[in-house]
C-alpha cells in the first residue's frame, strides 16, 4: 500500500521460507518428537532431547519464548482494542474506560478462556477458523476494490497508480540489493517461530506432513496474492474515491 509492488518481495521470501521449513524441519521434528517422549512444548522437547541439560534448556527456552511472545501477543491485543474502538466508538459508553481499553480487555478475556478451557486443540481450532476468515477476506476484498463501485478495473487502477507514482507498479525501482535481500530473508524467521514449530510437533503422523504442507502452502499462496493485490489496488481505490490513504 505504501511502498508499492517492491514490498511483495517480502511475501515471496515468506513463501519460500515457509516451504523450506515444511521440507527441512517438519518431518524430522515430528519424527524426533515421537522418539523423545511425545513432548508437546519446545522446552519439554529440548529437555527430553538433551537430558543432561534439561533444567537449563527448559529455563532458557521458556524465558526466551515468554519475553519475545509478550511483544507478539501485545500486538494482537492492540489490534483487538483498535478494532473494538473503530467498530463501537460512540455507540457504547464504558464510563472511565475507553472503547479501546475495553476492546483490549475483551480480547484478552476471550483468548484466556478458550486457551485455559480447551488447551492446544482449542487454539488450533480457533487458528483454523481465523485463517479461513482471513483467506476469504483476502480473496473478496481485492475483487471489491477492483470491480466494485468506484473500482474501475485493472486498467483504471494501473493508470491511477502510474499518475501518482510510476514506481508503485515496479518490482525493482528504488530497491537496493540490501533492501531486496532484507525483504526476501524475512522467511528465515519461520525456522524459529515457536507457534509454528509446535504445530509440526502436533501433526498426527509423519505421513500427514506432506498433506499438511500442501494445505498450508496453498492457503499461504492464496492469502499472499490477495494481500499484495489488496495493498496495491486498495491504494488506487482510496485515491480514486478521495479516501485518506494515511
Predicted regions and their residues:
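Membrane-interface helix-loop-helix modules in multi-pass membrane proteins
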Residues: 1-38, 177-190, 196-241, 246
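Membrane-water interface regions at transmembrane-helix termini and the short interhelical loops
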Residues: 2-5, 82-86, 109-130, 199-205
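Helix-loop-helix module between adjacent transmembrane segments
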Residues: 9-115, 185-189, 223, 231, ...
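Hydrophobic/aromatic positions within or immediately flanking transmembrane alpha-helices
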Residues: 11, 101-104, 124, 134, ...
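Juxtamembrane transmembrane-helix termini
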Residues: 27-34, 82-92, 121-124, 144-154, ...
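Membrane-interfacial loop-to-helix junctions in multi-pass inner-membrane proteins
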Residues: 42, 55, 59, 124-128, ...
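Small-residue-rich segments of transmembrane alpha-helices in multi-pass membrane proteins
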Residues: 48, 130-144, 218
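Helix-loop-helix junctions that connect adjacent transmembrane segments
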Residues: 91-98, 143-185
Amino acid at each position: 500500500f505504501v511502498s508499492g509492488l517492491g514490498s511483495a518481495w517480502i511475501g515471496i521470501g515468506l513463501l519460500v521460507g515457509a516451504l523450506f521449513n515444511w521440507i527441512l524441519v517438519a518431518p524430522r521434528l515430528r519424527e524426533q518428537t515421537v522418539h523423545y517422549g511425545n513432548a508437546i512444548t519446545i522446552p519439554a522437547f529440548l529437555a527430553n532431547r538433551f537430558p543432561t541439560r534439561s533444567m537449563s534448556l527448559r529455563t532458557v527456552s521458556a524465558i526466551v519464548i515468554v519475553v519475545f511472545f509478550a511483544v507478539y501477543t501485545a500486538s494482537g491485543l492492540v489490534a483487538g482494542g483498535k478494532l473494538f474502538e473503530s467498530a463501537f466508538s460512540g455507540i457504547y459508553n464504558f464510563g472511565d474506560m475507553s472503547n479501546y481499553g475495553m476492546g483490549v480487555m475483551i480480547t484478552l478475556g476471550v483468548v484466556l478462556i478458550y486457551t485455559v478451557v480447551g488447551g492446544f486443540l482449542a487454539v488450533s481450532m480457533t487458528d483454523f477458523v481465523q485463517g479461513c476468515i482471513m483467506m476469504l477476506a483476502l480473496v473478496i476484498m481485492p475483487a471489491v476494490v477492483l470491480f466494485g463501485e468506484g473500482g474501475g478495473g485493472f486498467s483504471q487502477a494501473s493508470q491511477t497508480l502510474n499518475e501518482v507514482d510510476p514506481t508503485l507498479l515496479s518490482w525493482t525501482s528504488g530497491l537496493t540489493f540490501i533492501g531486496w535481500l532484507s525483504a526476501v530473508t524475512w522467511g528465515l524467521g519461520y525456522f524459529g517461530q515457536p507457534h509454528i514449530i509446535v504445530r509440526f510437533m502436533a501433526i498426527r503422523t509423519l505421513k500427514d506432513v506432506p498433506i499438511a504442507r500442501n494445505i498450508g502452502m496453498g492457503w499461504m499462496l492464496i492469502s499472499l496474492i490477495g494481500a499484495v493485490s489488496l495493498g496495491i489496488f486498495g491504494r488506487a481505490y482510496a485515491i480514486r474515491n478521495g479516501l485518506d490513504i494515511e
